Curated annotation (Swiss-Prot):
It is found in: Cytoplasm. Pathway: Amino-acid biosynthesis; L-proline biosynthesis; L-glutamate 5-semialdehyde from L-glutamate: step 2/2. Its EC number is 1.2.1.41. The lineage of its organism: Bacteria, Bacillati, Actinomycetota, Actinomycetes, Mycobacteriales. Its main location: cytoplasm. Residues 1-14 have a biased composition (Low complexity). It comes from Mycobacterium ulcerans (strain Agy99). This is Gamma-glutamyl phosphate reductase. GO terms for cellular component: cytoplasm.
Amino acid sequence: MTLQAAPRSAAAQQREPDLRQEVHDAARRARVAARLLAVVPTGVKDRALHAAADAILAHVDRILSANAEDLDAARAADTPAAMLDRLALNPQRVDGIAAGLRQVAGLPGPVGEVLRGYTLPNGLQLRQQRVPLGVVGMIYEGRPNVTVDAFGLTLKSGNAALLRGSSSAARSNEALVNVLRSALDSEQLPADAVQLLSSADRSTVTHLIQARGLVDVAIPRGGAGLIDAVVRDAQVPTIETGVGNCHVYVHEAADLDVAERILLNSKTRRPSVCNAAETLLVDAAIAEHAMPRLIGALQDAGVTVHLDADEQDLRREYLAMEIAVAVVDGVDGAIAHINEYGTGHTEAIVTTNLAAAQRFTERIDAAAVMVNASTAFTDGEQFGFGAEIGISTQKLHARGPMGLPELTSTKWIVRGEGHTRPA
């Protein structure tokens, strides 16, 4: 995806100032809402989250009907199966979305948490505490659950959300946001704490990520094209969320029963998500007898195996039942390969050798490093902090699954008694 659209019609060019104004007006409303939410007690926000969960379940038929329309349009456009899976909702997934809101409601509120405090020799009392970021702009592709995840986490952390989802999920997102806004209104909280930018025009994204002074951070969540375009064109701070070229490395000291289970779970549990394994690395010392077993298990599970993987294969995020395979020379060969081809998301080693595991964890440059565990565990809920707003693959301001603390900044409170600084 690129934010630079093809040559636009005269009508579209005339509408450009209107779109910019619409985005900026929405951002201003969000800013007002964010200032109100910044001082709302955690208990009030938690009640609103439960109200939103109740409302989603009460309107499940409306939500699924809207999603069915999106799916029909996507199938008519020959959308790949992996993308259809991301787009699809069903009663179980809607139940999970509502449960995610309740889980967030049960988490400690980050706003006001004191990170450190002390008194200086001159008597000044200093305290550093968490405060909301403000207005969070979310740009994401066809995953309606992200709409609700973003709402829940931004509300609990005292932020307002400006959402720009994919046109492929437009009906689903609209239905969900309408339900969420009604829930906020019922709890006497500002409905503008969550707004959907509904225009399909890609310039809407540009206006959002260039709304310096109105939007505090932009978080793109989707494929490499979307993320690269947002980071390149943004004039507001951005947090990159994970393109996931994740590896499973089977070390020479691996238990192959364990390796097979981890590999299959990492690849096949949900191949369309960013924490799915995309490359299998096998230690040269065991390749002759391990490869037939591991490759056979993948093929039996319906995975297309790219044995003669070229440069393009090794850098590819398949998001499907496909995987690249390479043989590496020991743990150092695996580390070198991953640091060359990985995207800094999640990397796994399977081994019974503690020294090899330690070397791997110390030298792999990634947000999450697994030892004898599936890459599928890189997830906010699995990490124990509820839904995530994304998995950051950068090193500032957050890294890994982003929950509530990652949606805050800090403020210093300094208390004195008429203190003045000497000349």
